[in-house]
Amino acid sequence: VRRIVLARELSLEQIKEIIKKIKKERLNLEVECFIHGAMCVSVSGRCFTSQFLFNRSANRGDCLQPCRREYIIRDKDEGYELELDNNFVMSAKDLCCLPFLDKLIKIGVNAFKIEGRNRDARYVAVVTKIYRKAIDGEKTDLKELERVYNRGFSSGFYFSVPGSDEFVNLYGSLAKEKKVYVGKVVNYFSKVGVAEIKVDNNFKINERMVIEGETSGCVEFLISRFHDERKTANKGEVVGVKSPKVRKGDKVYVIK
């Protein structure tokens, strides 16, 4: 064993003591902690609700997330129902350690885990970039993380046991921005750095464009100009956009 992955229920002080013990015993062990992303309401994510209700196992990566839905209280004897002040009684906010990442680094955590399953390329690109900057000691801003999918942010168990205010009160994302699909790349001209795009939804100059593909990853840039000096690209047209390297078949979005 070279690395241990610590439970998400551990506090900062408990992690500190574990690392002290490892060093004291001269154990050749690395420590990994979860620092960003969705938090399962069950202890260490060992939830069977999706399996029980829909025969889709969370422990096999197939969770339908029934915890994210609204619930009511119903009297079994006479059927009376009560709506709660916040009906999302099992939907926890996302963990975000950016504000105190330096503390985890200081106590000696070796590796950080960021949620990536079922997330799009832009989410992965934005979140990993911000945390990479933080690890390298560069200035970061929580607002950057608020741009992509999130359910609101919590410090989890790092400083205390989460209370009722650590649960969300709506379904879906609180992201400040959203991607809008606008077309596909049909060609890329490397010599001039222009992507030819088949337009499915209108977009215009000075909007931020995101192009995603299996090989291209996530490419985000400001539309500075179209190849033919137009101002707007309309549905059904094929237009050229000045772009970093992308590939045929990549999906094209603008950020709203």
Regions found by a protein language model. Give the residues of each.
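Surface-exposed amphipathic alpha-helical tracts and adjacent flexible/coil segments at the periphery
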Residues: 1-256
